[in-house]
């Protein structure tokens, strides 16, 4: 998905006003890991996902998660913020219903919304709540990051909004995983075209 218009969706972080904001202190890390964080922050900053923030009320630490290929994924520990945020009750589909709906189709195309979360902008009034600390400063995401309590519900909401008339007919959506299904070969390419034009 290209950047999604904020008139369609933006991610909000409502917080319980009785819960006090938490500022996590910078955690110690191996020097080689801090360099990986610096590299990832620079990359995300340069593509416009991040901005520098001063005096944030909420502040979380970065956590590096090793990947199978030897690289690491930079995540943010939003546990404190997530505790203060009420659950978004937008429904996620039942997996068994999705499986039943694709049964019997001749062709299935599986798609993953690559960097899909990052196509959804943060609501301006909530942007600084997702602030995080590094050895080089504090930043916040201008786009919806992984790790926020209701990010999956927000993504499901936008996918349902964009594809509502195709779901359970030609397509199935579970958060950022999408399946285009067709009963015959001739219908599959036009169905895929319709999907990609919409997304």
Task: Describe each region flagged by the PLM.
Residues 1-199:
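Retroelement reverse transcriptase polymerase core
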